[in-house]
Amino acid sequence: MIAEIRPADAPPGIAAIYADIQAASGVPMINLIWRHLASLPGVLEWAWTAVRPLVASEQMAAARQRIAHSAALPALTPRLRADWAAAGVDDAALPDLAKMMAAYVRGNLTNIVALTALRMRLDNPALPAAVPTPAPPPPRAAPLPPLPRIEALPPALAGTVRALAARHDGTGDGVIPSLYLALAPWPGLLAALPDWLGPLYEPEVLRRMRTRVVQSAEAEAQSLLPACSPTSSGVAAMRPALDRFTRLVIPDLIPICLALNGILPAA
C-alpha cells in the first residue's frame, strides 16, 4: 500500500496544512496525493507552500474550466432516476452523491494543474515564477464522510473497488483512487460503473483521454510555475509520486469524475 496520513490520524502540524488545503481549494476532502506527501518528512509543507498561491488564484479557476471543457468525453447513455435507484442511489441520496462528485471534479482539476506546475518547476528551476492573482476565498465546503479503508470493506465490495482501480495505469502497489473508496456506500453504483461508463473504461480510450488531460494541464501550467523555496531534502523521495500522479493517476480519474458527474440527474 502507498504510504499516507489520513486526516483522522494527522498530527497537529499536518492537520493544520490539511485544513488550509481545504480552505484554499474549496474541497472538503484531502486527496491521496496530499496524504502521501504528508508521509514524507518535510514534503507536504514545502509542496503546499509552493502551490498555495496558485490554488487560491483566479488563474486556477479559469484553468479548471478550460481543462474540463477540453476533455471531449465520449457520448454516454443517459441514466434515469430509476437506473440510479436500481444501483442503490435513491432520490434522498442523489444530493449527497452530487455534492461528492462536484468535490472530486474540483479537487482533481485543481490538483492536476497545481502539481503539474510543481513538477514542471522542478524540471525547469531557472524559469521565472508566476505571480497569480488572488481569488476571493471559496465557500467553505460541507464535509464528506471519512473514506473507508479498503481492508475494512466487505470482501466482495473490496474486490469491486480493486477491480475498478486496476483499470487505471499507475495504480499498482496498492494505489486505490479515493473516488472509488468514496463511492463505497453505494456498492450497486460501483458495480454499474463499467457498464454506465463503458466507453471510458476501454484501455485505448482511457489512455487517449489521459493524454489529453496531461497535455491540457501542461499547457496551463507553463504560465503558472510556482516560486519554490530551497528544495526540501525529501523532494527526491516525492518525485516518483509526483510524476506518477500527474502523468497517470489524476489524469486517468478526471474523465471518470467528469463523466459520472455529467450523467447525474438534474436536481
Language model: regions and residue ranges:
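Hydrophobic alpha-helical segments
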Residues: 1-267
